[in-house]
Amino acid sequence: MILKENQLDNTLIMAKKILIMGLPGSGKTTIAKLLVPMFNAVWLNADKVREEVNDWDFSPTGRTRQADRMKNYAQKALDDNRNVIADFVCPTEQTRADFGADYIIWMDTIKEGRFEDTNKMFEPPKKYDF
């Protein structure tokens, strides 16, 4: 296949899964709104996903379940060769590993969120890209 100048075959590019994570109120959704059109991405907002499945369990088990759910939703988009941007707290190394992002954007903009239980369990990421 020969590509003409300024022509790109999207089948040659692997779709990516981008996680925007941080404490509640750190600006995750604000950044996601800006990046989604730039990357022509499917947007997974954790609050909207929780609302859709009516699962408001924020215990460690509930958060693991949410990370797995977000991973499964993202995989459906990746299977269609669509980029994915997911914005959610993803408070522990384990939930971040469960989600399995290609890139992590840490919104390190606040030191405490509005939910004390989340503040207590939040682990700053050891690895992030931006």
Question: Each predicted region: which residue ranges?
Answer:
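Walker A/P-loop
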Residues: T29
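Hydrophobic anchor at the beta1->P-loop junction of P-loop NTPases
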Residues: I20
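Walker A (P-loop) ATP-phosphate-binding motif of ABC ATPase nucleotide-binding domains
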Residues: K17
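ATP-binding Walker
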Residues: S26
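P-loop (Walker A) phosphate-binding loop of NTP-binding proteins
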Residues: L23
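Glycine-rich phosphate-binding loop used to anchor ATP phosphates in small-molecule kinases
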Residues: T61-E112
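Conserved substrate/cofactor phosphate-moiety recognition/catalytic segment
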Residues: A32-Y73
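Small-molecule kinase domains that catalyze NTP-dependent phosphoryl transfer to phosphate-bearing small molecules
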Residues: A97-D98, M107-F130
